Amino acid sequence: MVKLRLKRCGRKQRAVYRIVAIDVRSRREGRDLRKVGFYDPIKNQSCLNVPAILYFLEKGAQPTGTVRDILKKAEVFK
């Protein structure tokens, strides 16, 4: 099963997260299937590849709670 979840990047005390499609059995920092966006919680900024996100959601991918909140804020779910 595939999930849309956050992958931590950046440096200490300055985290930036990539939103990735990844196998549910993989570690947080494991190999992802595809990068579909990023989220910066400090600047409260996000950039999303909406067609790729919709593709994975149509194929049955489940977003985690935090990713679901980011997608709702960006109005991906209409």
From Swiss-Prot:
InterPro entries: Ribosomal_bS16 (IPR000307), Ribosomal_bS16_CS (IPR020592), Ribosomal_bS16_dom_sf (IPR023803). This is Small ribosomal subunit protein bS16c. GO terms for cellular component: chloroplast; mitochondrion; small ribosomal subunit. One of its GO terms (molecular function) is structural constituent of ribosome. Coiled coil: none annotated. It comes from the Eukaryota. PROSITE patterns: RIBOSOMAL_S16. NCBIfam families: S16 (TIGR00002). Its main location: plastid. It is found in: Plastid, Chloroplast. Gene3D superfamilies: 3.30.1320.10. One of its GO terms (biological process) is mitochondrial translation. It holds the Pfam family Ribosomal_S16. It comes from Panax ginseng. HAMAP family: Ribosomal_bS16 (MF_00385). Keywords: Chloroplast, Plastid, Ribonucleoprotein, Ribosomal protein. Belongs to the bacterial ribosomal protein bS16 family.
